[in-house]
Structures are given as structure tokens and as C-alpha cells.
């Protein structure tokens, strides 16, 4: 009986989500998300070549090159990662693009473990993990060497396999 109720509730939820999603247009989505912003764009912003994109969310992809857990307490968890991507310039040079992303809150506590468990779950993020991130650019900051980076507030994160 309980299983049937759960199945019915799950079906109702999925149908409701489908109806809601079909009501959204591409224009509605583009009012919220700016797909033109990439790590390359954010690197140009940090260098002062473009304004900080604000008012919309961005979708970024790249590889985690640094993980710094700032607050280890679950309730007030805060981690800053450096996300990096790059491109070949000709046959000999590679240009890299980076930004910092802060993830805060208890929902990220299990995604960014302080130590890798013996059997990590697929949604866990470690050094060198490829990611897709949805976030909001918030500021320009500098690292210990004085290099400027755009700081993004991370809202959602998913490893790419």
C-alpha cells in the first residue's frame, strides 16, 4: 500500500514538473542564464578587459585545480575551488582560464569531503574533477600571488564523467 502511494505521488510530481517546464520558453530561460559567459570571459573580466557580468546566472565547465575548505562545520560549510580550462594557441602554446567558486551551506558538505572516502559517491568533488557549475559572478578577488580572479557564488555543481 505504501509503495503504491509513493508511486502515485512520484507520478503526480513528474507530471507537474513536465507541465511547468513546458510552460517556460527559451526566452524565459535566457532571462535568467547568460550562456555567453565562460571561464575565458571571466578571465578577461579579472584582467579588466570586460565588465563583471551581473544579474544572470552562468554555466561554467572546467577542471578543479584547487580545493580550499574554509569552514569544515556542516551547518556553516564553506569551500572555495579554483576552476580551470584552457585552449591551444597554435601548436606550442596553451592559454588557461580560471575563476574561484565559493560553495556555502550544508548541502555542499558531503559533495566536498575533507578526505576522500574509500568508496566515494559519484557526486563527490575532488582535485582534478571535471565539473559543470551554475553560479553567480559576485566580485573580483586576488590570490596569494596577486593574480586577479573572478569570484563566483556556486549554486549547483555536477561532476562530468
Model-derived segments and spans:
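Bacterial N-terminal signal peptides that target proteins for export
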Residues: 1-9
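Bacterial N-terminal signal peptides
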Residues: 8-18
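OB-fold and OB-like single-stranded nucleic-acid-recognition modules
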Residues: 21-161
Amino acid at each position: 500500500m505504501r509503495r503504491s502511494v509513493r508511486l502515485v505521488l512520484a507520478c503526480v510530481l513528474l507530471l507537474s514538473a513536465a507541465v511547468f517546464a513546458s510552460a517556460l520558453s527559451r526566452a524565459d530561460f535566457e532571462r535568467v542564464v547568460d550562456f555567453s559567459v565562460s571561464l575565458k570571459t571571466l578571465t578577461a573580466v579579472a584582467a579588466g578587459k570586460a565588465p563583471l557580468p551581473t544579474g544572470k546566472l552562468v554555466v561554467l565547465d572546467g577542471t578543479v585545480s584547487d580545493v580550499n575548505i574554509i569552514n569544515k562545520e556542516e551547518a556553516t560549510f564553506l569551500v572555495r575551488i579554483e576552476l580551470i580550462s584552457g585552449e591551444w594557441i597554435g601548436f606550442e602554446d596553451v592559454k588557461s582560464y580560471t575563476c574561484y567558486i565559493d560553495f556555502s551551506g550544508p548541502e555542499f558538505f558531503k559533495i566536498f569531503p575533507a578526505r576522500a572516502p574509500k568508496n566515494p559517491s559519484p557526486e563527490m568533488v575532488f582535485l582534478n574533477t571535471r565539473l559543470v557549475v551554475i553560479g553567480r559572478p559576485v566580485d573580483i578577488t586576488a590570490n596569494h600571488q596577486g593574480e586577479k580572479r573572478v569570484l563566483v557564488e556556486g549554486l549547483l555543481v555536477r561532476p562530468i564523467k
